[in-house]
Amino acid sequence: MTDALTRIYVDADACPVKDEVYKVAERHHLPVTLVAGGFIRVPQHPLIERVAAGSGMDAADDWIAERIKPGDIVVTADIPLASRCVKAGATAIAPNGKPFTEESIGMTLAVRNLMTDLRSTGEITGGPRAFSPRDRSTFLSALDSAIRRIARRRAAPT
């Protein structure tokens, strides 16, 4: 079992791996907070909390970033939110299982900004590739690994 201080935050609007988060969180007895701009349906479970952060442009992102702390995990595809959470000392994982780290977040943010600019000029059309079963599997593995890594760090003598 992992220290109850670890909380999993989910940037829940359009997150394709909510069910996977529930399963892993239940296995490790970790609380989950799903944050969305509006109402979302979540299972009735004592470890699962739903937050409707409001309809502002970045309301859900701001809500998460203001509360996340070292040892917490955020699941998000939003690169600026991931950057804010990593800077706060949290672990950030994309729904496809890709971890956002201190070493990678700067380049990831720069590529995201470049792609946004290229799309706005019409140089690139379309979006990301479709979410696959392999992405789901990679995510499950990444989330489980992150939880175990945090638990080891907390258990290590200081």
Curated annotation (Swiss-Prot):
Lineage summary: Bacteria, Pseudomonadati, Pseudomonadota, Alphaproteobacteria, Hyphomicrobiales
UniProt record similarity statement: Belongs to the UPF0178 family.
Protein name: UPF0178 protein RPA2191
InterPro entries per UniProt: UPF0178
One Pfam family from the record: DUF188
